[in-house]
Amino acid sequence: MGTDQYHEPPDELPAHVRTFARMCASLVEEAEAIGWYEQRLALEADPEAAAIMREAQVEEFNHFSMDLEFLLRRTPLWREIAERVLFQPGPIVERAEVAEEEVIHGDEGDGSLGIGGRKGDEP
């Protein structure tokens, strides 16, 4: 395994952080493979070859999903945000902004950034 996914010396990192880094790398690799199959399928004229490629892509979807679930289980904050963004109706960016506000400031967030008012303003 290479060390290019690390920004800190790997031998100084605890085991769970190295595992997390490996799983992030695996997630990226699965996403790349999904994209590669999508490109191949877009050009493949032979139906039998396309069916085989589609089956392989489905396996990559499964691998990606397992990697993501592992990471979400190990990172509660990420999971909490993801649960409020994934598979929700409405504009994605809007849902993400609301999710961040809810997770950071609680469900009763007032929409502010929590920085405070100008000097002399009433609280």
Model feature map: region roles:
Residues 1-123:
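Iron-associated oxidoreductase/ferritin-like identity signal
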